[in-house]
Each structure stands twice: as C-alpha cells, then as structure tokens.
A protein has these predicted regions:
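Extracytoplasmic beta-strand/coil segments of soluble accessory domains associated
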Residues: 22, 37, 41-44, 69, ...
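Gram-negative outer-membrane beta-barrel transporters
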Residues: 363-370, 441, 446-449, 462-535
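Short acidic/polar hinge/loop motifs at secondary-structure boundaries
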Residues: 109-136
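Structural signature of Gram-negative outer-membrane beta-barrels, strongest in the C-terminal barrel
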Residues: 225, 234, 322-326, 345-448, ...
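Membrane-embedded beta-barrel scaffold of Gram-negative outer-membrane proteins
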Residues: 273-289, 336-337, 395, 401-403, ...
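Transmembrane beta-barrel wall of Gram-negative outer-membrane proteins
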Residues: 172-201, 206-240, 252-273, 320-325
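N-terminal Sec signal peptide and the immediately downstream disordered periplasmic leader
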Residues: 2-65, 69-75, 221-223, 595-596
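Conserved C-terminal beta-signal and adjacent last beta-strands/turns
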Residues: 223, 427, 504-597
Length: 597
C-alpha cells in the first residue's frame, strides 16, 4: 500500500523541467540499449520476444558495485541465495531456476565450470562491464546449455574519441574491505585498446568469509582497411576467499580463471556479415573443507580441479528491411580433472567434444515480428539435444508491445555424469509500454516445466519434475522533483509436477524498490530495498527488507572529473538469508573516490 501511495503521489505531482513524452520514450528504449544481443541475434528491443533485462555500466556505478554478484540483487526475477563479503562465492536463481541451470557468459564465452556447472559471478569485476543482458527463461536455442536463462556480460570497448583516457578509483570499508581499480582506453588511427585491472580484498564481514582477489582485462582492437575489425581479449581473475565458517565447520577456495579470445567480423556485402572467434579458457581451483568426521574428531578434505575449454565459432548474419537471419556453429573441446588432494584419488577425469549448430530468424510483418529459432547440440558426454523456440511481438503503438515466447531447453549439470542433462519447456506472455504519461511498465507471465531433475544421494538417485509458474512486474517513473522510483515484483509457485505437492525452497515473493535523486550540482542518492520470501521451513531468516543507501558527488574540471562516493549497506541491520550457515552481513559502511581523466 505504501508503495502504491508513493507511486501515485509521484505520478500526480508536477514534473521538474522534463518532457513527459521524451522521458517515457527513453525509459521504454533503455536509452542506448535499444538493440539487445542476449539472444545471439541482435535486434531491437521492440522485436525481442524473450524476457530480457539490460543493466548498463551507469546503473552499476550508481550502486557502487564490486562484482557481478552485487548487480544480481537489483534485477527483477533474480534472487541471490546469500549476500556475503564482496568477492566471495554466491548462489543465485533466475525465476526459481538454480545456478547450475543458468549460463553465464563473458562476451559470449561460458564461465560456468565443468564439474557442476557453477558460474562464479563474484569473480567478474564490474569495471570491465559495459552492460549485462539477462535472458530469463530457456535460452538453449541460442546458447545450448542454458535451461534457466543466460547472463551475457558485454565488456567495454576502446574509447573512439581520444588517444588516452582512463580512470583510477579506490574504496575502503569495514573489516579492511578495499577495492582499487584502474583503466586506460583510447584509439590511435586504426588501433584501439582497453585495459583494466584491480584488487579486491577484505578480512571478511562474517566468520571465515575473507577475500583477496586480483583481476586484469585487456582488449585490443584493429579496424581492417575494408569493412571489418579484429579483436583480441584476455581476462584473468585470480584469488582466494573463505566460503563460510560455523564452529569447526569451514571452507576456503583458491581459484584462477583465464579467458582469451581472438575474434573478427567482416561485412561481406551490404546485408551479409561474417563473425568468427577462437576461444580458450583455463581454470583451476583448490577447495579445502574442514569439519567433524567423527565425534570429537575434526578432519579436512581437499579437492583440486583443473579444467580447460578450447574451441571457436563462426556466424553468418543477414539483415535487411524484412528480416534478420543468423546461422552459426560452435565447437569446443572440454576437459576436467578433479582429485581428492589428500587421498590422491581421481573424482573426475573426462574429456568431450561439443558441437552446436543454430539458426535464428526475425521476420517483420507490419506490426508483427516473428522469431523462430532452433539449435542442435552434440554434447559428447550426455547425448544430443534439439532446442527449438518461437517468439512473436506485436507493436500496439510506437511505445507499447505485446510479447509471446515458448522454448525447449536443457542444462548439463556435470561433466562427470552421462545422465546429468535436465530439461525444460518455457512459456511466456508479456507486455511493455511507455505510453502511460511519466511511467514505463513491463509485465510477464511465465511457466517453466522442468524434468529429469536429479535428486537424492549418489546411492539412490531419483529424477523429478518441477513446475514453476508465476509473474514479474517492473515499473519506472520519470524524475519528479529530481526523484524517480523503480519497482519490481516476482511471484513464483512451485510444485512437484502439474498439481503435486508444494515445492519448498522456491522464492515465492521477491520485491525490489529503488528511489533515485539527482540534482543539478551532480549529487546523486540511491536508496534500494529488496525482500525475498524463500518459502523454506529450514534454518533461514528472511522477514526483513534489506536497504542500501548509495551517495555520489561529482566535481567537473576542464579535462578531468573527481567523484566521491559512499555506501551504507543493510542500513537497518536486517536479516535476509536462506541458511543459517550463510548469514548476511549486518550494516557496513564504505567510502571511496574515483577520478576520470
């Protein structure tokens, strides 16, 4: 009720120096992100049938985020199972789909590990991010192993306007929480470069929850004499962190991830473009876990993992006034080796060759846009899979669209088991409008029918079918008295089968609220709240709304700018966690400064 009253007051109040129609249009188009590529076939948002949310680098700066994990808390339909010390591993869900059902990509390269399909979103620093595209619902017709959706991190490109530009920043918070970053970017003739590096460390806001992470990302770009370009990228994420600590029970992990690519794109003719890339990924991890192995006896387990991916892809795209056709092939050779570091016993030692063929078309017929897509995958370890999808949009007006989408998808939850493939059929109906004066509004109904879900112990594995259906609603207002409001709500009902027993642990209600204030002196304040009803009878505690306050003040000079920022996280010291072992931190404060040149 309070939220409704606030929204009504803001909509009824007179605007402050803004054009209602123009600002509503910007809200609808996403202001610079009107073309989305999360489906692998870039198309206008008004012709995109999938439920996609885009988060830009400006949005990320506003919340003083450290890693991709911090960004997830602010996306409607996404739930973090735990909020911990910056840089430490977290689990998350998308519309109730577990983390091992969601494919996370760095410029189209998967970062999910092979052992259990875990994507370490806390390892990706936000400084390299230009935008993030969240595809909610099966995305297998584009990416293959993406039952619950895809999160595509699109990195920054060289600054085309200057030879040298950059940024340095540092922040400091409680428990010696420190984040230092720098970046350089520019273009000289045909050659462009983007470089960034940083260090994130903390003594731990919770018991045995320390972090010490280093990162580097580099992109070199060369514009070919004709209509094309060549890119080379390398990303290195390295460091250690404490996962949890509860008495004698504790776990620590030390990991390294290196992703390198060489990519090119070339305009063969006016409507035809070819893109190709070579990709290599190397990762290693060492997990140490301590706990009671017998009454009064504390033991230690160690697991060491080495994984690699080597492959490439080639894609052809045809674009004209009537349609956008995309066809391509992916190939990768994957290998994973896991050993018990104490007993020196192999737990996983497997290789596979994976091939995927995909085809997508967006056909524009008047106000309609039809998007049939399909992909065939030969996984090399868990059989072959065909993943079709079909989407349709109908433009009610220039600023309002109706959407429908249905798709089949799958996820490989482990390279270690041949019977590790879980499958889904996703159906969605939605709308998006900017025609209401001063308001952008989006709504989606969804149903995710997932089967062959592995349950039980290794001795007695069973396969279950889960149905999760619900709704998402998002809204944004234009600034009124320099203050704007954003809201998001997600409802999910989970059952075993169509009408079976209630499914515990599915986030039933998720609420996100944000207030943003920006005055003419370049001062900004953001107040964000989030609430998750985990609907779980376990040891969790989630009755509170967690509020974060972010403040920024920018001072402009002739060629540089200085920004001072501060964050108070968990402002009212609330509890919001799924499991008592993974409690969330209490209130903590962080201060920082950023210089752009």
């Amino acid at each position: 009720m309070l939220l409704g009253c606030t929204l009504s007051m803001m909509l009824c109040a007179p605007p402050a120096n803004c054009d209602d129609d123009l600002r509503s249009l910007e809200l609808y188009n996403g202001e610079g992100t009107e073309v989305v590529s999360g489906t692998r076939s870039p198309r206008p948002a008004s012709q995109t049938a999938e439920n996609i949310t885009v988060v830009t680098s400006q949005d990320i700066d506003a919340i003083n985020a450290h890693t991709l994990a911090d960004v997830l808390s602010y996306v409607t339909g996404v739930q973090l199972e735990m909020t911990r010390t910056p840089g430490t591993p977290v689990n998350f869900e998308v519309q109730g789909s577990n983390f091992n059902h969601v494919l996370v990509l760095l410029d189209g390269v998967p970062i999910n590990n092979l052992a259990d399909n875990f994507p370490d979103v806390s390892s990706i620093p936000v400084q390299l991010i230009e935008r993030v595209e969240f595809v909610k619902g099966a995305a297998s017709s584009s990416w293959g192993n993406a039952l619950g959706g895809g999160i595509n991190v699109i990195t920054k490109s060289p600054d085309p306007e200057r030879a040298v530009g950059g940024m340095v920043s540092a922040s400091y918070g409680e428990r010696e929480t420190f984040d230092a970053r720098a970046e350089l970017s520019g273009t000289i003739n045909r050659f462009g470069y983007y470089l960034t590096g940083g260090k994130l460390r903390s003594d731990g806001l919770l018991s045995n929850n320390m972090s010490d992470k280093n990162n580097f990302y580099g992109k070199l770009q060369y514009d070919l004499p004709a209509r094309g370009s060549l890119n080379m990228t390398t990303a290195v994420m390295d460091g250690e962190s404490g996962m949890f600590g509860a008495g004698v029970n504790r776990a620590n992990i030390d990991s390294t991830l290196v992703v390198s690519t060489i990519a090119t794109q070339y305009q063969l003719m006016d409507h035809l473009r070819v893109e190709a890339a070579l990709v290599t990924t190397e990762s290693s991890a060492k997990l140490l876990r301590q706990g009671l192995v017998a009454p009064g006896t504390v033991g230690t387990m160690a697991f060491e993992t080495e994984e690699s991916r080597l492959g490439g892809n080639i894609q052809l795209s045809w674009l004209d006034d009537l349609q956008r056709i995309t066809a391509g092939i992916d190939y990768e050779h994957v290998s994973a080796h896991m050993v018990n570091g104490i007993a020196l016993v192999d737990l996983l030692n497997r290789r596979a060759d994976r091939v995927g063929l995909y085809l997508s078309d967006t056909l524009t017929l008047g106000r309609f846009a039809l998007t049939p897509s399909a992909r065939f995958d030969s996984t090399g370890s868990a059989g072959d899979h065909f993943s079709p999808s079909f989407g349709v949009t109908y433009a009610l007006t220039e600023n309002s669209v109706l959407r429908g989408y249905t798709a089949r998808g799958y996820s490989l939850t482990s390279l270690n088991r041949s019977a590790s493939t879980e499958k889904v059929w996703t159906s969605q109906l939605g709308f998006e409008t900017g025609d209401i004066p001063g308001l952008w509004l989006k709504g989606t109904l969804f149903r995710n029918d997932t089967w062959d879900i592995i349950s039980g112990s290794t001795r007695a594995i069973t396969y279950e079918r889960h149905v999760k259906q619900g709704a998402e609603v998002e809204a944004k207002t234009i600034p009124v008295y320099r203050t704007s409001l954003t809201t998001g709500y997600t409802y999910i009902r989970g059952t075993h089968g169509d009408s079976g027993p209630h499914l515990n642990g599915v986030p039933k209600h998720t609420v996100q609220v944000g207030l943003r204030y920006q005055d003419y002196s370049a001062f900004q304040a953001h107040l964000n709240g989030r609430f998750i009803d985990w609907d779980n009878p376990g040891t969790g505690k989630y009755g509170a709304i967690i509020w974060d306050l972010h403040l920024r003040k920018t001072v402009e000079f002739s060629e540089t700018s200085l920004e001072i920022f501060a964050s108070v996280r968990n402002l009212f010291n609330g509890d919001q966690y799924l499991d008592a072992v993974y409690r969330n931190p209490g209130r903590w404060v962080e201060l920082g400064v950023r210089c752009n040149f």
